[in-house]
Swiss-Prot record:
Lineage per the UniProt record: Bacteria, Pseudomonadati, Pseudomonadota, Acidithiobacillia, Acidithiobacillales
Organism annotation: Acidithiobacillus ferrooxidans (strain ATCC 23270 / DSM 14882 / CIP 104768 / NCIMB 8455)
Record NCBIfam families: lumazine-synth, PRK00061.1-4
A Pfam family this chain is assigned to: DMRL_synthase
Reaction(s) the record says it catalyses: (2S)-2-hydroxy-3-oxobutyl phosphate + 5-amino-6-(D-ribitylamino)uracil = 6,7-dimethyl-8-(1-D-ribityl)lumazine + phosphate + 2 H2O + H(+)
Subunit architecture: Forms an icosahedral capsid composed of 60 subunits, arranged as a dodecamer of pentamers.
A single GO cellular-component term on record: riboflavin synthase complex
Catalytic residues identified in the record: H89
Protein's name according to its UniProt entry: 6,7-dimethyl-8-ribityllumazine synthase
Keywords linked to the UniProt accession: Riboflavin biosynthesis, Transferase
EC number: 2.5.1.78
Binding-site residues, (2S)-2-hydroxy-3-oxobutyl phosphate: G86, T87, R128
GO MF terms held by the record: 6,7-dimethyl-8-ribityllumazine synthase activity
Transferase in keyword set: yes
Length: 154
C-alpha cells in the first residue's frame, strides 16, 4: 500500500518568527498582516508569533539564520518586497536574498519560507499584497504551517 504524507494546516503549539523588511513598508505591512491572519485562522495564538523587523530584504538571511538556529521557532517566514528599478540593484538583491533564505533552511533544517515579492513594478507588488493576486504573506504562512507539520511526519 502506498503511504501518502501530507502536512496539515494547523498551528498546534508551533512557534513562528515573521521576519519583515521595513523597506517598502507600505507593501510589507500588508504581507505581515496577511501572514498573521493566516496563522491565527489556523490556530496560532499571539504568544506563538514573534515579528522581527529588518532594514531591508538583503539583511534577511543573516537574521533568519540566527532565528532558525535559536531553537525557539519551528518556522521562519521572510516577508519583503524587492521592486525593480532602473539599475541592476534589483537583480543582485533578489538573487542573493532567495539564495540566502534557501541556504538557511537547508543548513538548519528549519523551514525558512520565501515570502519576498520580486516584482517589476509597484503595481504588481500592491496586487500581491492583498488586492487582485491575493496576499503572498498569507500564502507564505500557509506554506509554513504545512512544512512544519510535514517535517514532523518524516
Amino acid at each position: 500500500m502506498i503511504r501518502h504524507i501530507e502536512g496539515s494546516l494547523q498551528a498546534g503549539e508551533h512557534r513562528f518568527a515573521l521576519l519583515v523588511s521595513r523597506f517598502n513598508s507600505f507593501i510589507t505591512q500588508q504581507l505581515e498582516q496577511g501572514a498573521i491572519d493566516a496563522l491565527r485562522r489556523h490556530g496560532a495564538k499571539e504568544e506563538q508569533l514573534h515579528v522581527v523587523h529588518v532594514p531591508g530584504a538583503y539583511e534577511m538571511p543573516l537574521i533568519a539564520q540566527k532565528l532558525a538556529r535559536s531553537g525557539n521557532y519551528d518556522a521562519v517566514l521572510c516577508l519583503g518586497a524587492v521592486i525593480r528599478g532602473g539599475t541592476p540593484h534589483f537583480d543582485y538583491v533578489a538573487a542573493e536574498v532567495s539564495k540566502g533564505v534557501a541556504q538557511v533552511s537547508m543548513d538548519t533544517g528549519v523551514p525558512v519560507i520565501f515570502g519576498v515579492l520580486t516584482t517589476d513594478s509597484i503595481e504588481q507588488a500592491i496586487e500581491r499584497a492583498g488586492t487582485k493576486a491575493g496576499n503572498k504573506g498569507f500564502d507564505a504562512a500557509m506554506t509554513a504551517l504545512e512544512m512544519v507539520q510535514l517535517l514532523r511526519q518524516i
